[in-house]
Amino acid sequence: METTVGALGENTTDTFTDFFSALDGHEAQTGSLPFTFSYGDYDMPLDEEEDVTNSRTFFAAKIVIGMALVGIMLVCGIGNFIFITALARYKKLRNLTNLLIANLAISDFLVAIVCCPFEMDYYVVRQLSWEHGHVLCASVNYLRTVSLYVSTNALLAIAIDRYLAIVHPLRPRMKCQTAAGLIFLVWSVSILIAIPAAYFTTETVLVIVERQEKIFCGQIWPVDQQFYYRSYFLLVFGLEFVGPVVAMTLCYARVSRELWFKAVPGFQTEQIRRRLRCRRRTVLGLVCVLSAYVLCWAPFYGFTIVRDFFPSVFVKEKHYLTAFYVVECIAMSNSMINTLCFVTVRNNTSKYLKRILRLQWRASPSGSKASADLDLRTTGIPATEEVDCIRLK
């Protein structure tokens, strides 16, 4: 039966064309959301293929992606955990913007502690061989995909919230029920769109040179479903990249016009000027986050489009796998940038960590719940300008 071979994670996929050609007698369709081509069409005899995992370029790429995964586990794991803990403890942080940021934090935290260790084993330790079974293969693939879409949808929701708060300040702010519905929509849309990533993910035993076996973990689409695959990819590309980027760009362009190019009527007090400076800094930070998102993910989507719709471009490229690793590392680094911008910098995570540790240290083992609650209230975070900046009310 002809198959299409996808890769580990729809947002961190791989296509190892050098050893996929071992599927002799089959038409391999490879890609994050795979495309169709036959190795026989390009006269690539099996005995001329080499195991790219033993090359120097692959070794260098393995080191790079290993460093990226370690960085994600440390930055996203620790930073997002502290932010989520602080948000649970301090009520003054629970505004709409921070709740939307919490969606980013939760999704990136799950990827850092659940997916990254398995990917480290797959990419670096076992050099492109999966040893953890079909269920974990599909689960890791699915969680990575959901995390990407949650991040995209949350960034879009934050942009819309800033637009409404700054361009239409007299309109009532979003109620708790509406905010809960928005958060539910962010997750439900991401979960539904990512279902094919889990449904088509499976394991495939591949035999490379010298009869060495590699267990490939990724999406495998039947060749006769090529039209549906490409339609699905274009749908995802439009809904989870092009559409959100255009919408966020329009929102921040309108907000920037409001903050920088529109005269404020009346006499400007020091408090008004301080709030204006605060809003400008926050919007600049959000624009930087949007720019980082585009710079990190545009190469990945562009690489995927060329690979999936114009396979002849890469099929004989010697350093194709190394190029993919570079593109993938750039895309994965976006989660670290989000954590540093939203969690560590904007919310001063170290201050929250010190307060949480002090609270635990001061609470005696025999202390009552009432005294612990009093301790929590007395160590609450003051309404500083930094907190006002993130709230932007």
From Swiss-Prot:
<feature type="topological domain" description="Cytoplasmic">
    <location>
        <begin position="84"/>
        <end position="98"/>
    </location>
</feature>
<feature type="topological domain" description="Cytoplasmic">
    <location>
        <begin position="344"/>
        <end position="393"/>
    </location>
</feature>
<dbReference type="InterPro" id="IPR017452">
    <property type="entry name" value="GPCR_Rhodpsn_7TM"/>
</dbReference>
<protein>
    <recommendedName>
        <fullName>Prokineticin receptor 1</fullName>
    </recommendedName>
</protein>
<dbReference type="GO" id="GO:0007186">
    <property type="term" value="P:G protein-coupled receptor signaling pathway"/>
</dbReference>
<feature type="topological domain" description="Cytoplasmic">
    <location>
        <begin position="254"/>
        <end position="282"/>
    </location>
</feature>
<dbReference type="GO" id="GO:0005886">
    <property type="term" value="C:plasma membrane"/>
</dbReference>
<comment type="function">
    <text>Receptor for prokineticin 1. Exclusively coupled to the G(q) subclass of heteromeric G proteins. Activation leads to mobilization of calcium, stimulation of phosphoinositide turnover and activation of p44/p42 mitogen-activated protein kinase. May play a role during early pregnancy.</text>
</comment>
<dbReference type="InterPro" id="IPR000611">
    <property type="entry name" value="NPY_rcpt"/>
</dbReference>
<dbReference type="GO" id="GO:0007623">
    <property type="term" value="P:circadian rhythm"/>
</dbReference>
<keyword id="KW-0812">Transmembrane</keyword>
<keyword id="KW-1015">Disulfide bond</keyword>
<dbReference type="Pfam" id="PF00001">
    <property type="entry name" value="7tm_1"/>
</dbReference>
<keyword id="KW-1133">Transmembrane helix</keyword>
<dbReference type="GO" id="GO:0043066">
    <property type="term" value="P:negative regulation of apoptotic process"/>
</dbReference>
<dbReference type="GO" id="GO:0004983">
    <property type="term" value="F:neuropeptide Y receptor activity"/>
</dbReference>
<feature type="topological domain" description="Extracellular">
    <location>
        <begin position="1"/>
        <end position="62"/>
    </location>
</feature>
<feature type="topological domain" description="Extracellular">
    <location>
        <begin position="201"/>
        <end position="232"/>
    </location>
</feature>
<keyword id="KW-0297">G-protein coupled receptor</keyword>
<feature type="glycosylation site" description="N-linked (GlcNAc...) asparagine">
    <location>
        <position position="11"/>
    </location>
</feature>
<comment type="similarity">
    <text>Belongs to the G-protein coupled receptor 1 family.</text>
</comment>
<dbReference type="InterPro" id="IPR000276">
    <property type="entry name" value="GPCR_Rhodpsn"/>
</dbReference>
<feature type="transmembrane region" description="Helical; Name=2">
    <location>
        <begin position="99"/>
        <end position="119"/>
    </location>
</feature>
<keyword id="KW-1003">Cell membrane</keyword>
<dbReference type="GO" id="GO:0060976">
    <property type="term" value="P:coronary vasculature development"/>
</dbReference>
<feature type="disulfide bond">
    <location>
        <begin position="137"/>
        <end position="217"/>
    </location>
</feature>
<feature type="topological domain" description="Cytoplasmic">
    <location>
        <begin position="168"/>
        <end position="179"/>
    </location>
</feature>
<feature type="transmembrane region" description="Helical; Name=6">
    <location>
        <begin position="283"/>
        <end position="303"/>
    </location>
</feature>
<feature type="transmembrane region" description="Helical; Name=7">
    <location>
        <begin position="323"/>
        <end position="343"/>
    </location>
</feature>
<keyword id="KW-0325">Glycoprotein</keyword>
<feature type="topological domain" description="Extracellular">
    <location>
        <begin position="304"/>
        <end position="322"/>
    </location>
</feature>
<feature type="transmembrane region" description="Helical; Name=1">
    <location>
        <begin position="63"/>
        <end position="83"/>
    </location>
</feature>
<keyword id="KW-0472">Membrane</keyword>
<dbReference type="GO" id="GO:0004930">
    <property type="term" value="F:G protein-coupled receptor activity"/>
</dbReference>
<feature type="transmembrane region" description="Helical; Name=4">
    <location>
        <begin position="180"/>
        <end position="200"/>
    </location>
</feature>
<feature type="transmembrane region" description="Helical; Name=5">
    <location>
        <begin position="233"/>
        <end position="253"/>
    </location>
</feature>
<feature type="topological domain" description="Extracellular">
    <location>
        <begin position="120"/>
        <end position="146"/>
    </location>
</feature>
<keyword id="KW-0807">Transducer</keyword>
<feature type="transmembrane region" description="Helical; Name=3">
    <location>
        <begin position="147"/>
        <end position="167"/>
    </location>
</feature>
<keyword id="KW-0675">Receptor</keyword>
